[in-house]
Amino acid sequence: MEPPAAKRSRGCPAGPEERDAGAGAARGRGRPEALLDLSAKRVAESWAFEQVEERFSRVPEPVQKRIVFWSFPRSEREICMYSSLGYPPPEGEHDARVPFTRGLHLLQSGAVDRVLQVGFHLSGNIREPGSPGEPERLYHVSISFDRCKITSVSCGCDNRDLFYCAHVVALSLYRIRHAHQVELRLPISETLSQMNRDQLQKFVQYLISAHHTEVLPTAQRLADEILLLGSEINLVNGAPDPTAGAGIEDANCWHLDEEQIQEQVKQLLSNGGYYGASQQLRSMFSKVREMLRMRDSNGARMLILMTEQFLQDTRLALWRQQGAGMTDKCRQLWDELGALWVCVVLSPHCKPEERAGWLQLLSRWDKLDVCPLEEGNYSFDGPSLQPTMAPAPELLQKGSTCITNTEGWVGHPLDPIGCLCRALLEACRLEEETLTLYPDSGPEKRKVAYQHVPVPGSPGESYLVLALEVALLGLGQQRALPEGLYAQDKVVRNEEQLLALLEEVELDERLVQVLRKQAGLLLEGGPFSGFGEVLFRESVPMHTCARYLFTALLPHDPDLAYRLALRAMRLPILETAFPAGEPHPSPLDSIMSNRFPRWFILGHLETRQCELASTMLTAAKGDPKWLHTVLGSIQQNIHSPALLFKLAQDACKTATPVSAPPDTTLLGIALELGLQVMRMTLNVMTWRRREMVRWLVSCATEIGPQALMNIMQNWYSLFTPVEAATIVAVTGTTHATLLRLQLDTSRREELWACARTLALQCAMKDPQNCALPALTLCEKNHSAFEAAYQIVLDAAAGGLGHAHLFTVARYMEHRGLPLRAYKLATLALAQLSIAFNQDSHPAVNDVLWACSLSHSLGRHELSAIVPLIIRSIHCAPMLSDILRRWTLSAPGLGPLGARRAAKPLGADRAPLCQLLDAAVTAYITTSHSRLTHISPRHYGDFIEFLGKARETFLLAPDGHLQFSQFLENLKQTYKGKKKLMLLVRERFG
């Protein structure tokens, strides 16, 4: 901080000898204050000391001392305001980094030392303990003050911040709390006037000697100017005295580091994309509001500095050049800026000349090109560019269902309802006796206390009642949703801020009567009310307001509360888009931005609608009449499956408390909502469907077995076959579910039968995905299992893929049914086709398993499957692999097969001779195919391929001759490939 500047020039009057002025000591409690102190207090806070000296030619020294004594600020609230943040510190820091808190700790630890007040100047030393291993640090602090305001500060620390450092706070609080312990002296000019020439010379020389390194150049320069007769310093009467207080013309305001404020705002705006930057700017706005509340002129000064930096934000020109709107965070900051200017200009405490100066400033700023519009969504100024008029029927409807002024009071740029409501509540607010850094924040936030303050001239009225009436009047007004994303978002935010104010008010009997009266008026308000019977389709919904009214009225008038909330459940824009009885084109996408391009906040409004419905369901627990009424309203007005599902979950959770029996009616409501969600999303693919289906089964389980069987019996309209077979039937028959239901044997079998019927129906409808789950579910019932098996056989003829058939066949083998597994494997092979070059076909392992199965069953099954293998598989390596596997052991030696041969089958005998011929033919065909487009880098692979072919050829009695003829044929046919043929000769001769 910079050292305080010299104040005003003073003459050197010959004052009386200094007398003791010990009147600063605190007076005993209950004793009247001296007239001298009463007068000095009033003068000290209203008049500059220069004005006192001009008015009275001689001011006695005791009077001077009392005026100087009382000129220092007397309240810690101002010190706190100029040394604390406007928002709570991060979690865990416990205000440790707030200068006011640190200064208070320094004061309480005895760190303040050598405090001296000379006139209007206070100085002292602050000893701050160092970090572990570091020495104690000493800081010298100087404070200048005038008319109960600190006008400048100086500290030896390097802390550069918007407000006072902890050392300034410690010294200021010491002066306020221990004023009688501070040594008090009159301004230094008064002391100098009592010295003769020798004393003055000695004083100056001692001063220069003590600080020669700092003041010697300045002292020599001043001496030269004084000795020069025509110098400027000799033309001025008197000399400056930094301890003599401010002059008459000097501004009387608290010290504010303007340069630091400008730098801080500039830096924060450049980091505007970060949450912390916006938070700190809001903190500065809060500080301005605090200053305005305390009628501190620095509020307007600080706001001017901030506005200038906002207008110099480089992003404004960029957004204007690109034709893009400003970000949401930035728009909110500009809104706050505008709201503060409204408070400043309309303040009843400002002077007319101040207001005129501010208006001139605002007009100049408004003419700047970069100054953003208050509503940036209206960009067409020319009459020819205006949007065309809406269709006549819509205009007629709008005229009959909406008030003349379509611009609502809530969400208006000037926020008339919010300002009026806050002003009325401020008049009723009880003052806090204790000093609090953050009265509106923190985990231990106390509820604000309000009291009824009567309105003068209006018997029976109070400002608190008026505040409630005004707020409900604005919130319940029917108003069209404005154009543009930000304007719509502002409507929502203003509404929430207004309701937050109302929630702070504790409702007594008087306010409850007002609430009931206003609720009745809103229900009967016609087109002027958002709760009226007829709404314009683009009216702002009343969900948030209705939720507050419902909660407030419920203990006092439940019938009125439900009627109001049910009326507010409407969302007119969706009622128009989805007429009753018509199917929704896309149930999951109720927003449908292409159909509602202007309703940017529709998702938020639907969420608020859901919250209102959830509140009503929770409140209606135990009341079947209202529960079914609320359910009907939900089914009629809520069109989002995701929100309906959330409502169903909330209702189920509320209906099943941990330490109480479940509410069966509310559980039924939850199930009904879940069923509606299932029907709405049946034909829509969404990642949440599986979660929804599982939850529905668990909800039905909570109700009982009949509910579970009902959803199984009506699965066609609720689930896909896969969901029904793999989730509903399986989950509904798990051990945990059966234990939960606590069924006897007959009821358990009834549930199992229902699940098996469901599984068979799903298998018939979608055998490809449901056949195996159906077989698994029907394992314990022979007839059902046979029916499921027959469904698989029928589906195989109808196009069931080989992969699914192989899967079911493996399942059959695992179940100990090898013949059925063999049957399904042959059906799968009949559909399979593996080309000569598909060595890594996905079905290779399945084919080898099928061959192994047939070999284990016996020669008859092996003979039957060979033609299928030859017809389906044309890959030579696969055929030779199968052939070798079958020749390793005798058929029928498997664990389930009969021993029908004493030795392995020969490859040259039936039934394997056909397979051998097929393998040889496949090798010959594949070789010719590969040689057609072979490249030199594949010669090595081809030679290896011929090596495997020779092994297969040699399985035949005349295999050696066949292979030699095959090679000769290759050499003659492909004699142009000399290098390849050379490699063939080297390997095979």
UniProtKB/Swiss-Prot annotation:
The keyword Cytoplasm does not apply. Residues 1-32 are annotated as: Disordered. The gene is ZSWIM4. The keyword Transmembrane does not apply. A zinc finger (SWIM-type) spans 139-176. Keywords: Metal-binding, Zinc, Zinc-finger. InterPro entries: Znf_SWIM, ZSWIM4-8_C. It comes from Homo sapiens. One of its GO terms (cellular component) is Cul2-RING ubiquitin ligase complex. One of its GO terms (molecular function) is zinc ion binding. This is Zinc finger SWIM domain-containing protein 4.
